[in-house]
Regions:
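Polysaccharide-binding surfaces and accessory modules of carbohydrate-active proteins
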Residues: 24, 34, 183-257
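N-terminal secretory signal peptides that target proteins for export/translocation
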Residues: 1-3
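Acidic-aromatic substrate-binding/catalytic surfaces of carbohydrate-active enzymes
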Residues: 33-147
Length: 339
């Protein structure tokens, strides 16, 4: 009992946690062969097992306060393990979806290459997410081992994702972690944070907010442009912001009325290697974290808060309560953010 009590005392966000394990879980969780649905008093979310996987499935993240949903393909959606440099010398030898074309509007002019793949969200096809029910939260964990690799690289690096949904909150906390089987001078993981924005000439959002670039109107996203052309963040090129927040203000495409902000907040700004916010048929919100030297057997990770907020000030308040964390741990007794 002493060990259990001590463990709970050091949990981050202690007000949301309870030792009253006998109380019923405040979430309704339904599960089929294809998906898991989590429904609480503040939000709903679907996690797919098959098809387009990882994170929260697009269009299913519901804010019960306002009735708005996310406007994209999903939240905290995961791609390849990558590094700087070109694959042109061996591109014809790369299996599957590992070739990385650049010098285009999709990927810009910065040479990058895949170390391992495939892109999990589109190519894994099926994952085995596990539900954890706590006294006042629900959580989902999942993992995947990459099975494609560039010439001279091994397969088998492991990706792990944890998502925790605290009762009564309009957001979830997540963490993505890579345990590497390859060495690299600057390995990074590519994901969508919070997620891309589907729109027709800005009809689904009224603003984008980037903590490193400020407020941006929809008129900036009417024509396609390359990632580095506008609103790009690159560690070592741009100053590291105090908070790393990327958000968009939802808008009802039928009425034009504003809804809540949907934000993705990386709790330790220093882990972000590069972050895009560019138009390519939709607003692409790719984020890459890591980008530092790594050896086989080592790991790197990032932690996020993703969800609905009424104002930028509210985002900042929540961010500041949890800033500096890079990981997340969970079991049936509780959860905690870790540094």
């Amino acid at each position: 009992m002493r060990a259990f009590t001590t463990w709970l005392c050091i949990l981050t966000w202690a007000p949301f946690l309870s030792i009253q394990a006998a109380l019923p879980n405040p979430f309704e969780i339904s599960e089929t062969e294809d998906q898991i649905k989590i429904a609480g008093s503040a939000l709903e979310a679907v996690v797919r097992k098959k098809g387009y996987v990882t994170g929260v499935f697009g269009g299913t993240f519901l804010d019960k306060k306002t009735g708005f949903r996310d406007a994209g393909y999903g939240l905290d959606i995961v791609d390849w393990i990558m590094e700087p440099g070109s694959d042109e010398a061996y591109r014809d030898q790369l299996p599957g979806d590992l070739p990385y074309q650049f010098n285009n509007l999709y990927h810009g002019t910065t040479p990058k290459r895949s170390i391992e793949g495939p892109q999990i969200c589109t190519k894994a096809k099926e994952l085995a997410p596990r539900v954890i029910r706590g006294p006042d939260f629900a959580a989902v964990t999942m993992s995947y081992r990459y099975h494609l690799a560039a010439p001279g690289k091994k397969t088998g690096s492991e990706w792990n994702q944890i998502m925790v949904f605290p009762a009564g909150r309009r957001y979830f906390i997540s963490s993505d972690r890579i345990t590497a089987v390859n060495a690299s001078d600057a390995m990074f993981l590519r994901l969508d944070m919070p997620g891309h924005i589907k729109h027709k000439r800005g009809d689904t959002f009224s603003q984008v907010y980037l903590s490193y670039a400020g407020r941006i109107p929809p008129s900036e996203f009417l024509q396609d442009f390359a990632p580095e052309q506008k609103f790009n963040y690159r560690r070592g090129v741009n100053p590291t912001p105090q908070r790393f927040i990327r958000a968009y203000r939802l808008r009802d495409p039928k009425t034009g009325g504003d809804g809540p902000w949907l934000a993705g907040m990386t709790l330790e700004p220093a882990v972000v290697y590069e972050a895009w916010c560019h138009q390519r048929g939709y607003v692409c919100m790719i984020e890459e974290f890591g980008g530092r030297p790594i050896q086989p057997g080592q790991s790197f990770r990032a932690a996020f808060i993703v969800g609905f907020f009424d104002s930028i000030e509210e985002m900042e308040k929540v961010y500041d309560q949890h800033a500096g964390h890079t990981g997340l741990e969970v079991n049936e007794r509780g959860w905690r953010l870790v540094k």
